[in-house]
Design a protein with these regions (language model features):
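Long, charged, low-complexity intrinsically disordered regions
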Residues: 1-100
Length: 100
């Protein structure tokens, strides 16, 4: 096991998996997780293709690759600057709350 936050897309359709992946990336940026795992399965590769096409277009993604030990899983690395921007926004909001 890789102990990364994991999204399992087994049983999902291509169009719904796009929404789930985007939400999963957003959630993990908020949580400051640099690496995540998206499980698409091996099968015919439809979900894998959908996920990889989505990741290829997402400017927040540094890189992605098939997990060496589990070819049904893609490891995704989020660019550090997106994690830091979110952290700075969070800290700024925390200061506003503290001032009240």
């Amino acid at each position: 096991m890789n102990n990364l936050p994991e999204l399992d897309l087994h049983g999902e359709y291509s169009f719904s998996s796009e929404v789930l992946v985007k939400e999963f990336i957003n959630d993990n940026i908020v949580l400051h997780n640099k690496k995540i795992c998206i499980v698409h399965g091996i099968g015919e590769g439809i979900l894998k293709t959908t996920v990889h096409n989505l990741l290829k277009k997402d400017k927040r993604i540094e890189k992605y690759y098939i997990d060496f030990f589990n070819p049904g899983c893609t490891i995704v690395e989020i660019k550090k600057e997106y994690l830091w921007v979110n952290l700075l926004l969070f800290l700024d909001q925390a200061e506003l709350v503290k001032e009240r």
